[in-house]
Amino acid sequence: MKNKFIIFLSIFYLFFLNLYANTTPPFKNISVHEKPIQYNKIVFEDFDNQQIDLKNYNNEIYILNFWATWCAPCKKEMPSLDKLQQNKNIEIFAINLETKNEKKTKKFFKDLKIKNLSIFYDPDLKLVKLFNIRGVPTSVILNKDRKEIARIIGDIDFSNTDFINWLLNTTGNKQ
């Protein structure tokens, strides 16, 4: 009887240890919201001045990455963000906050060998105001209902296995 109790406690402990490990952000610059934040309209533009509205997408996870070509940390994290875009459950929108300059922006992507990401703009800085963006890089993580569940201020390695596992577990648990 005593052995069964010890086995039960061990399993119970391992279960909650695993649960905690999967919900704790792997990087200190990730801020997880206790309650998801709802936004009414998330709209930005592509190179062709076409409006992109998130309500027209159907994914499990959205990442809005706010960046600039002059930003060294943005340059550092962009290849890992490009790699993460290969995940079919994640839709990443790399939103350049500079004045629209197609030549400069495409060169930035070409120099970094970015192949999976598309480039978007926030020409009137409406999203900057909506999301209260204070600097770059900043990444806003939204769940399938397009509610903000977490925010990353500064650069991270988006291809880090611990981050990917945390991201998939967190977005699956937040409603």
Task: List PLM regions with ranges.
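Bacterial N-terminal signal peptides
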Residues: 8-17
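Structural microenvironment flanking redox-active thiols in thiol-disulfide oxidoreductases
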Residues: 75-112, 123-130
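Positively charged n-region of N-terminal signal peptides that target proteins for export
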Residues: 1-5
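Thiol/disulfide oxidoreductase modules built on the thioredoxin-like
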Residues: 110-115, 122-167
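Short active-site neighborhood of thiol/selenol oxidoreductases, capturing the structured segment around
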Residues: 53-75
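N-terminal "domain-start" segment that seeds a small globular fold
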Residues: 22-54
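Hydrophobic beta-strand anchors of alpha/beta hydrolase catalytic cores
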Residues: 63-64, 92, 139
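Short loop/turn microsegments at loop-to-beta-strand junctions
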Residues: 39-40, 62, 136-137
